[in-house]
Amino acid sequence: AGFNMWPGPYGNFSSKKTLVNALDGSLKRMGLDYVDIYYSHRFDPNTSLEETAEALDEIVRSGKALYIGISNYNAAQTAEIIKYFKELHTPFVVNQASYNMLNRGIEEDGLLDTLSQNNKALVAYGPLAEGLLTDKYLDGMGDDVKIHWSNEFVIKHGKDELVKKLNELNDIAKNRNQNLAQMSLAWLLHDPTVVSVVTGASKINHLEDNLKALNNLDFTSDELAQIDKIVKE
């Protein structure tokens, strides 16, 4: 819950009424008694984090969810709600955030460190930057290419500069016997705080190809330094 679930009052964000009603509706539609993980998918500027935490805790105590997650909460918001979860002994396990080799916002914000220090996990969504971190654009990007708002900043120096960076990253991937997508996923998963990635595939062979990232999750310090230099320059 967190984004629009229905029109009108309490149809989005993370108040107690919204969280409870949204889950009840989802369980009914799915024909289930409970979910494994229930996410507050968006920080609510009009609801205290204490209320959100207490609502999520009650949902677990009522047997409707086994674990709790949050999504799109920054480092400060995450640290504060973790404090409430600890007081309540709520089984909070994960924050889901936009993160990929090009999009380092959560590193700069301190979210990765906050989760690591509290022994909590990160699930990365947009791990391939909506297709940018694949072989799709190695030969160039047309004017009709649309980039998700969360990654728009990566073309601040122009599409040609981005294509140059993608090819430089691809050269590192080839030296690792991986393609760019596989290395991008492996780069995320080599961090012990990152327990999973949310990636889609329109074809089975795309999924099978992505899974090969698991064959090599180890990076040398030189590889990591080269990647950082390319991305951050």
Please describe what each predicted stretch is:
Residues 12-30, 78-82:
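Short, acidic/polar
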